[in-house]
Structure formats: C-alpha cells, structure tokens
Amino acid sequence: MASGILLNVKEEVTCPICLELLTEPLSLHCGHSFCQACITANHKKSMLYKEGERSCPVCRISYQPENIQPNRHVANIVEKLREVKLSPEEGQKVDHCARHGEKLLLFCQEDSKVICWLCERSQEHRGHHTFLMEEVAQEYHVKLQTALEMLRQKQQEAEKLEADIREEKASWKIQIDHDKTNVLADFEQLREILDREESNELQNLEKEEEDILKSLTKSETKMVQQTQYVRELISDLEHRLQGSMMELLQGVDGIIKRIENMTLKKPKTFHKNQRRVFRAPDLKGMLDMFRELTDVRRCWVDVTLAPNNISHVVIAEDKRQVSSRNPQIMYRTQGTLFQSLTNFIYCTGILGSQSITSGKHYWEVDVSKKSAWILGVCAGFQPDAMYNIEQNENYQPKYGYWVIGLQEGVKYSVFQDGSSHTPFAPFIVPLSVIICPDRVGVFVDYEACTVSFFNITNHGFLIYKFSQCSFSKPVFPYLNPRKCTVPMTLCSPSS
C-alpha cells in the first residue's frame, strides 16, 4: 500500500520531458512542472521552429518566460523521495528499475547498463543502441571469460613481478650489507695504516728529540763552563786594577797574552732546514689503491690446479694447494744417476686448470711462511719440455711467462725479457717490498694485455704490473713452490 502511494507520488514529481525525477523544478502558470534544463531546451526549440511561440509541452498552453517560477515545494518532495526507499521486498527486486519500477530487460551498449523501457525513452539513453539482455548476454559472457583468462595471466605475471622485486630487494640488501662490511674493513685497514704511521712518526720524533737534546745539553754544559771561565778572568782583572801596583804587574804579560789568544768555542747546533720533513701518508693514493683492489676483486674466479704427473710436487685433494717434495731428487737417464737441482725450479711449476682467452680474471695465492716461490701466468708449456736443462732460463714474457718470485725469504724480483746479448737469460729486477706478503693477488686483463700483482697483506699495494703483454694464445694461472716445501694455496673467492 505504502509503496503504491510512493509510486504515485513519484509519478507526480517526474519530469514529462526526461521522465526523471525533477531537477531544479520550474512550474508554468498552467500548473505543469519541468526540470529547469528540460524546459530551457524546449524553449530554445520553440524559438527555433515556431517563430518565438512558447507553449507547455504537456497541455500546449502558451506561456511567457517571466511567468515561469521555481517550485520549491515540488523540489522538497523530490528531495525527500530520493531519501525514501521502497519496501524491503521491492528493494530486493534487483530485476526491476530502481527509478521506474519496471523490469530490467534491456542493455544500453553506450553506457554498459541494464535498463527498463522507460529508461530507454529517457533523455539519458535517447539515441543509444539498446538490446534485449538475452541477445547480448552470451556475447558478453564470452568476452568476460576471455577477460578472466587474460586477468589470470596478468595475475601470474604480477605474482612473478612481485617475486622478482622481492628477490631483487633481497639481493640488493645482501649486496649492500656486503659493501658495508667491505667499507668497514677498508676503513679499519686505513685506520691501522694511520695508527702505524703515527706510531712510527712519533717514535722517530722522540728519537730525534732525545739525540738533539742530549747533544745540546752537552753543548750547554760546555757553554756554562766557558762563561764561568770568562767571568773568573773578568773578576781577576778587576781585582788587579783595584789592587796595589805590585798586584797589577805580577804576571801581567801572561794574563794579557792568554786573554788575547782566547777564542770562544761555539756550541754544536742543528739546522732546522736539515731536519727530515714530516709528510702525512698519501691517503688519496691509499684510497685509489683500495678502490683498484676492490674493482679487480669483483673479477675473482675460482681457480683450481690442473692434474699432472710431476713426481716432485704434491697437489692436495681439493686441487687448491701445491707443495714440493724434498729437492734432493735423483734423476736416472740412460742408466746414469745425476742430481738436477737447477732444473728442479721448472719441474715444480703447476698450471691452473682454467684457461684465460678473454675478459678479466683475478685470484689470490697464500704464500705465508714460504721462503721461495714463483707465481703469475703462463701461456702453457709442454710437460716433456720441462726436463730440458736450458728451460731454467726461460722465465721471460717473450716465452710466455709473466711472473714474479721470492728467494731466500726476502729477495723479491720480477722476471723480464733478457737483453740481446743474453736472449736466453731473463733480466731479473729486484722489487722493493716493504711488507712481505702472506697473500698475493693476481689480476689478468686479457683485452688490456696487463698482468698485475697485489700485496694483500699490505692493504692491496701494487707489487708490479706487466703492460703490453703479448697474449697470442690462452694463458693459465701459474704456481711454482720451488725448493721450499711449505705449500702454496689458491684462495677461494669466499675466503
């Protein structure tokens, strides 16, 4: 009953033109009410086609624009009606139009809305393409099914993107944490260097202070004695001048001669411009070296030793460690027993299993506690040739060796090409190594044709760098423990 009354009221406040609830209702003197926009549009049409005649769209009674009045009473009814819901039963009827109460049987293609027949005739949907729901339901069902499959694919892509970004986030965190650790370690090394340099400088200054002040104290004592002696002479002369004639003349020539011949001794002094000038450590150079070492360490490769049949060396099971046997090896050739300690250096040379034909490669070798070793890169050698007695002279770049070495525990050297007078003898150049390395880093840049050696023990300082290397064929890591039985160890990248 109540819903019927509401429907009747709704009909009374519905615009006859747009068939919607009145919006800003205006009433003509004939009593009919219209939306302000609808009656204005109707007025414009009347002016265009009927030569200025204005008439009510419902009853066709003429009207004048000044007779149009806002209908606030109807506006209030419309406002209240919009707030009022129909009965619960009617509200649950989703197949009926909420505006007109008619069955929702049509589909408006332009607005993608289900509408009733009154909606179809309204201003909102006028001129639109409308269809029975049954005509388009199957078509849109297929489209929605296709869209659903597309969404499921998008969901998989989205989940993969989500997983990828999480993985990247975790990777970045690990990398940054690793970089933080490296930064802390690098600056700790810098602090160690600065502390050591500071301690050395202070010790030098204390020694300098002790030596100089000790010498100046001795000079000061002599100067005090000399001053006292002069004062005593002055006192003696003053006494003679004030005394009797006999006291004045007694031994006067000797005193005058002694004064005339007296020469003041000057103290031993130290010229300040001769002092050793203190220079702060080259922090920029240190940082540059740290950066260089950090860069090359990004090219760290996991090097292992190649298997071999050399009886004079022992390779560990993990193929990372090599050591020499007792060098007093006896060789038997054609029934003759002879000792070849010279050839032993080359007989203990071992190649890494990884060949280098391009790119950048870095590895580190632990040589702690060894008194002799040779390491670097080699362009490969024939095992049979190692027994050639002349090969102990072929550690030269032109023969495919870019190596440095240690002998007698303190003598570091680099093997360079020999002169034209001694082409088969390498030119052995001593290296200045302040801190003996327990670990040596080797960096090969194949395209740049360089081989660099770093003292990892001394904060990554560069030991030596070969430039313009002639890499005409693959090169290999090279280790030679020489006659020292202490092992050499290839370090893993994680060490």
Swiss-Prot record:
- Which UniProt keywords are present, listed alphabetically? Acetylation, Antiviral defense, Autophagy, Coiled coil, Cytoplasm, Immunity, Innate immunity, Metal-binding, Nucleus, Phosphoprotein, Transferase, Ubl conjugation, Ubl conjugation pathway, Zinc, Zinc-finger
Residues recorded with modification Phosphoserine:
87
Using the record's annotation, list all stretches that form the B30.2/SPRY domain: 283-495
Tell me yes or no: is Metal-binding among this UniProt entry's keywords. yes
Q: In which pathway does it act?
A: Protein modification; protein ubiquitination
Q: What does this protein do?
A: Capsid-specific restriction factor that prevents infection from non-host-adapted retroviruses. Blocks viral replication early in the life cycle, after viral entry but before reverse transcription. In addition to acting as a capsid-specific restriction factor, also acts as a pattern recognition receptor that activates innate immune signaling in response to the retroviral capsid lattice.
InterPro entries given in the database record: B30.2/SPRY (IPR001870), B30.2/SPRY_sf (IPR043136), Butyrophylin_SPRY (IPR003879), ConA-like_dom_sf (IPR013320), SPRY_dom (IPR003877), TRIM/RBCC (IPR050143), Znf-RING_euk (IPR027370), Znf_B-box (IPR000315)
Q: Where are the zinc fingers (RING-type)?
A: 15-60
Q: What is its main location?
A: cytoplasm
> Where are the residues of the annotated region Required for interaction with GABARAP and for autophagy?
187-200
How would you summarize the oligomeric state and partners of this protein? Can form homodimers and homotrimers. In addition to lower-order dimerization, also exhibits a higher-order multimerization and both low- and high-order multimerizations are essential for its restriction activity. Interacts with BTBD1 and BTBD2. Interacts with PSMC4, PSMC5, PSMD7 and HSPA8/HSC70. Interacts (via B30.2/SPRY domain) with HSPA1A/B. Interacts with PSMC2, MAP3K7/TAK1, TAB2 and TAB3. Interacts with SQSTM1. Interacts with TRIM6 and TRIM34. Interacts with ULK1 (phosphorylated form), GABARAP, GABARAPL1, GABARAPL2, MAP1LC3A, MAP1LC3C and BECN1.
Q: Name one GO molecular function term.
A: ubiquitin-protein transferase activity
Known EC number(s)? Answer: 2.3.2.27
What is recorded about the protein's domains? The B box-type zinc finger domain and the coiled-coil domain contribute to the higher and low order multimerization respectively which is essential for restriction activity. The coiled coil domain is important for higher order multimerization by promoting the initial dimerization.
Protein name as catalogued: Tripartite motif-containing protein 5
Q: Where are the zinc fingers (B box-type)?
A: 92-133
- PTM note: Degraded in a proteasome-independent fashion in the absence of viral infection but in a proteasome-dependent fashion following exposure to restriction sensitive virus.
The reactions it catalyses are: S-ubiquitinyl-[E2 ubiquitin-conjugating enzyme]-L-cysteine + [acceptor protein]-L-lysine = [E2 ubiquitin-conjugating enzyme]-L-cysteine + N(6)-ubiquitinyl-[acceptor protein]-L-lysine
Compartments annotated for it: namely: Cytoplasm; Nucleus
Please name the CDD domains in this protein's record.
Bbox2_TRIM5-like, RING-HC_TRIM5-like_C-IV, SPRY_PRY_TRIM5
**Per its UniProt entry, what is the enzyme's top EC class, as one word?**
transferase
Q: Where does Zn(2+) bind?
A: 97, 100, 119, 125
Coiled-coil residue windows: 137-223
Where does the record locate the signal sequence feature?
Answer: none
Q: Which GO terms describe its cellular component?
A: nucleus; P-body
